[in-house]
Amino acid sequence: MKPKDLKSPFKWEHRQIVIQDRVWYVPDQHLSDIPFIFPGWTHDQTFAQDKPIYLEYCSGNGAWIASKAIEQSQYNWVGIEKKFDRTRKIWSKIKKFELDNLLTICGEGFHVTRDFFANESVDAVFINFPDPWPKKRHAKHRIVQPAFVKEIHRILKSDKLFTLVTDDAAYSKIMIDVIYQTGGFISLFEAPYYTTSYPGYGSSYFEELWREKGKSIHYHVFRKI
């Protein structure tokens, strides 16, 4: 099925939180009179099978997470992407490859995490090529903020890994600083706390794009302590 085949289950003036056809919609407001109750990860609406949850933020068009769901079917994969046009592309891949171990969430990462993920419920977290918002006046829009890192620490199981990937050297340093200042994590790499070679990690649209432009990719891996 093509991305355009996915239609929103509600009109904007009647937006609501709903899980439908491998997509979990989390708009900025829930305007239904019926409260949303998350059914759990083993419900038919989500995964049915009880497997470790691997969570990706900034999923983009879904190339990375779809390939991971195919290669590593022993995990349940969740991709969070706030833009509906990109969510459609992830959904299209779910349908094309019949991925019953991949669910996409269309919503804002921090609020979705805070409102719907239980303590120590996730086995791995990935953030691939988040928008660096390089201008100082836009810094508040960056996903890697102290409050967000605290939420990742809360939902991640003990000793599990938090991986971040960027092509932006300045943002790499910012993310490292935020994580260490927030606390609760330790890098798997010695200073400068990243590697530019991480075989087997997988590729995405942005990774291929920036490599073609000659950019170096920074991989950061932190363990929850």
Swiss-Prot record:
Superkingdom as given in the UniProt entry: Bacteria
Name of encoding gene: trmB
Uppermost EC category: transferase
Keyword list, A-Z: Methyltransferase, S-adenosyl-L-methionine, Transferase, tRNA processing
Keyword S-adenosyl-L-methionine assigned: yes
Pathway(s): tRNA modification; N(7)-methylguanine-tRNA biosynthesis
Reactions accelerated catalytically: guanosine(46) in tRNA + S-adenosyl-L-methionine = N(7)-methylguanosine(46) in tRNA + S-adenosyl-L-homocysteine
Protein name stated in the entry: tRNA (guanine-N(7)-)-methyltransferase
EC number, as in UniProt: 2.1.1.33
InterPro entries from the UniProt entry: SAM-dependent_MTases_sf, tRNA_(Gua-N-7)_MeTrfase_Trmb, tRNA_methyltr_TrmB_bact
Record-stated family: Belongs to the class I-like SAM-binding methyltransferase superfamily. TrmB family.
Keyword set includes Cell inner membrane: no
Binding site for substrate: K135, D167
Transmembrane segment boundaries: none
GO terms under cellular component: tRNA methyltransferase complex
Chain residues that bind S-adenosyl-L-methionine: E56, E81, E108, D131
Pfam families: Methyltransf_4
PROSITE patterns: SAM_MT_TRMB
Active site: D131
Gene Ontology molecular functions: tRNA (guanine(46)-N7)-methyltransferase activity
Role, per record: Catalyzes the formation of N(7)-methylguanine at position 46 (m7G46) in tRNA.
